[in-house]
Amino acid sequence: MKDIFQLVSDYQPAGDQPEAIERLTEGLAAGEMYQTLLGVTGSGKTFTIANMIQQVQRPTIVLAPNKTLAAQLYSEMREFFPRNAVGYFVSYYDYYQPEAYVPASDTYIGKDASVNDHIEQMRLSATKAFLERPDAIVVASVSAIYGLGDKDSYLNMVLHLMVGDTVDHRGILRRLAELQYQRNDRELYRGTYRVRGEIIDIYPAESEQEAIRVELFDDEIESLSYFDPLTGEILHRVSRLTIYPKTHYVTPREVLLQAVDEIKIELAERLEQLYGANKLVEAQRLEQRTRFDIEMILELGYCTGIENYSRFLSRRQPGEAPPTLFDYLPKNALLVIDESHVTVPQLGAMYRGDRARKETLVEYGFRLPSALDNRPLKFEEWEQLAPQTIFVSATPGPYEQQHSGAVIEQVVRPTGLVDPAVEVRPAGSQVDDLLSEIRQRTAADERVLVTVLTKRMAEDLTQYLEQHEVRVRYLHSDIDTVERVEIIRDLRLGKFDVLVGINLLREGLDIPEVSLVAILDADKEGFLRSERSLIQTIGRAARNLHGRAILYGDKVTGSMGRAIAETERRRKKQLAFNETHRIIPRGIQKAVREIIDGVYTPGSGKGHRSPDRVEEKAAEYTRLPPQQLAKRLQQLERQMHKHAQNLEFEQAARLRDEIKRIKGWVFNGADSASAPRQENSQARAIC
């Protein structure tokens, strides 16, 4: 039988990778429910997981702690599995202000959100991959445990078409309306359809570049094909196809009517409780808001905040778990949790924060009690749904340690690089000593990361270093994701030499140019100076041939001692492996390419833009706020469709390529249409 998962890479597993792949595969075959891959920074954990997926040939969901790391993993998995269905499932909100009420000031804050159309399309494509293909890999954030449309209702609404079937022309249009597709005979874009005689063109909501053409002859389907919505070129013909709803939250009409009846019953019960407690204002508010929602549902099929009635729409019992992405997983799926020491606690925290906010809304008459069931999964519910699981972390947390049947170490790097040497120095002269170390590193054209305890300290230290003519920037939580990526990229390019930060300098920073990590006030016990945090931070220097970590403190705390001991244990094992196998460590020469894609290789061919110009263009778009960026993309898409209508296909194609490039810069999902990607080194391919 031919393998359905086909890993594409020029490199073979090395270091500890072959043993890790073998042990993980054997553990899955033996039925181990939980395993942990304890892989140090730069050891190629993603490449190990990719090889394991190819070995076991099972669909996989990969959970990441945030959108940034999810985008990096998505990009890497697409490179490893170009012939398979690799999906991306994160929150589709560019901006989200949840509904809330502050009793102290009697302030009601309505829900406000901006939906990213591109990510919504990728979410739909991800669930479709799980439903249709056995070779699906989906990278998701903790958004995967939030309520999604009921899987059974979603599947019951799909429209199946087959060549030769007898159909009613009006019946197809009626079914498309039920799937929430809109008719638009002037321009065709995602989620719309147009009718020209006996030809029906449909642009599926989950499709990025292909539309569907249904050709009828009287009441019979004569032809089904996929075509380019810009040029009209037929791409390929098929004998059958399936059209999925425009949204995960589509609901049959009969279910809506049944839900309305149940909402009315709960409203009557809740009003009786409020009047009995003499809460007249709350009762009046609740009745007015709920009856308005009911009218909207009956007339339009939806209302603002319809998710608060999701328990009725998905026909669940009070307290029953909501449908989520995990309900869409195939029975033989695998779960990989990246940076599990961060992701697992997040999974437990989502429910508690959501519950506290909604209880206030219910208490003061803004929502019915059933709104409490519009929630993420509880941790126990997630545990019941989770398939065989592999935790991936350099510093596994207590949950992983307690539950894992096997802990597989991946300490030896394919490049032969070893963990940095760790040194403890007095805190009294830490700033002056740091300045001296920075001078040495910058003279060698190397970069420095410095971690402090507070935002104020980060800003003050940055100002002090600037006064001493050090090229320095700081990084903390007030800086948004896109600007954060730009700062890291500028550090790698050498636009500055020192980056000062707090907690943001731990997981997910891949900067081979950093040769020194300095941890100020390392002897201050706490979350930021715990054993796990220190090991993660020290690991930021592990990708450099001259990597070194300095911990400034007047005493060696328990956390410091354990972190230093663990780093030294790994370092000894790596050095012994290198000596036994006569490996000479080599530095990583990694192309400067991260979540903001689209920087072209110099001299990559005639007609390509210069690197500087492209960098400026990429920076221009990535600096835009999400709402402005979405608006700009919509403007370009409208212009593209207008050119296509006027048969100006060259201009339309140019705009299509421009849109693709922009999405590549921002979402790291699309390749640049006019420039090849840079070739990565061996270390980049396997790390």
Curated annotation (Swiss-Prot):
UniProt cross-references to Gene3D superfamilies, sorted A to Z: P-loop containing nucleotide triphosphate hydrolases, UVR domain
GO biological process, one term: SOS response
Subcellular compartments: Cytoplasm
Binding locations of ATP: G39, V40, T41, G42, S43, G44, K45, T46
Keyword Metal-binding: no
Gene Ontology terms, MF aspect: ATP binding; ATP hydrolysis activity; DNA binding; excinuclease ABC activity
UniProt entry keywords in alphabetical sequence: ATP-binding, Cytoplasm, DNA damage, DNA excision, DNA repair, Excision nuclease, Nucleotide-binding, SOS response
Motif (Beta-hairpin): 92-115
Location of the Helicase C-terminal domain: 430-596
GO cellular component, one term: cytoplasm
Domain UVR: from-to ranges: 630-665
Keyword Repeat among UniProt keywords: no
InterPro entries documented for this protein: Helicase/UvrB_N (IPR006935), Helicase_ATP-bd (IPR014001), Helicase_C-like (IPR001650), P-loop_NTPase (IPR027417), UVR_dom (IPR001943), UVR_dom_sf (IPR036876), UvrB (IPR004807), UvrB_inter (IPR041471)
Function comment: The UvrABC repair system catalyzes the recognition and processing of DNA lesions. A damage recognition complex composed of 2 UvrA and 2 UvrB subunits scans DNA for abnormalities. Upon binding of the UvrA(2)B(2) complex to a putative damaged site, the DNA wraps around one UvrB monomer. DNA wrap is dependent on ATP binding by UvrB and probably causes local melting of the DNA helix, facilitating insertion of UvrB beta-hairpin between the DNA strands. Then UvrB probes one DNA strand for the presence of a lesion.
Subunit structure: Forms a heterotetramer with UvrA during the search for lesions. Interacts with UvrC in an incision complex.
HAMAP family with a match to the protein in the record: UvrB
Domain comment quoted from the record: The beta-hairpin motif is involved in DNA binding.
Family the entry assigns: Belongs to the UvrB family.
NCBIfam families: PRK05298.1, uvrb
Protein's name according to its UniProt entry: UvrABC system protein B
Species this chain originates from: Nitrosococcus oceani (strain ATCC 19707 / BCRC 17464 / JCM 30415 / NCIMB 11848 / C-107)
Lineage: Bacteria, Pseudomonadati, Pseudomonadota, Gammaproteobacteria, Chromatiales
